[in-house]
From Swiss-Prot:
Organism this protein belongs to: Platanus occidentalis (Sycamore)
Protein name: Small ribosomal subunit protein uS11c
Localization, UniProt: Plastid, Chloroplast
Family of the protein in this entry: Belongs to the universal ribosomal protein uS11 family.
Residues spanning the signal sequence: none
Region (Disordered), start-end ranges: 1-23
Coiled coil regions in record: none
GO BP terms in the entry: translation
Gene: rps11
Pfam families reported in the protein's UniProt record: Ribosomal_S11
Gene Ontology annotations for the cellular component aspect, listed alphabetically: chloroplast; ribonucleoprotein complex; ribosome
Keywords: Chloroplast, Plastid, Ribonucleoprotein, Ribosomal protein, RNA-binding, rRNA-binding
Length: 138
């Protein structure tokens, strides 16, 4: 019978394997998903592995305040602060969604000092696909 692999360390001692903050990442991709209710900022390396992420809800905003531009700016700042410490200098930005946080998140990314190679809008647009839901009557 094969011997089980002995694992050194435990949950209390700390995680086993390579930590995400151990890598040096010179170039990455910043994904901004801005909905009307929240803004999610995810930073990945060029292969698509997540390095850092933040959202307006994770930054402490609750309810309707999560959809505000200020919340998006805070979320973008938090996500980017960690990758700048890991040595990221260049990035591509992919913005998705119709939310209010689009411009505010992009402004926060520009202010961070990361050189942006391009900014692309990847909002999914139907070529007359599914029928949209009926209009709200308030």
């Amino acid at each position: 019978m094969a011997k089980p692999i002995q694992r050194i360390g435990s949950r209390r001692n700390g995680p086993i394997g390579s930590r995400k903050n151990g890598r040096r990442i010179p170039k990455g991709v910043i994904h901004v998903q801005a909905s009307f209710n929240n803004t999610i900022v995810t930073v990945t390396d060029v292969r698509g592995r997540v390095v850092s992420w933040s959202s307006a809800g994770a930054c402490g905003f609750r309810g309707t305040r999560r959809g505000t531009p200020f919340a998006a700016q805070t979320a973008a700042g938090n996500a980017i602060r960690t990758v700048v410490d890991q040595g990221m200098q260049r990035a591509e930005v992919m913005i998705k969604g119709p939310g209010l946080g689009r411009d505010a998140a992009l402004r926060a990314i520009r202010r961070s000092g990361i050189l942006l190679s391009f900014v692309r809008d990847v909002t999914p647009m139907p070529h007359n696909g599914c029928r949209p839901p009926k209009k709200r009557r308030v």
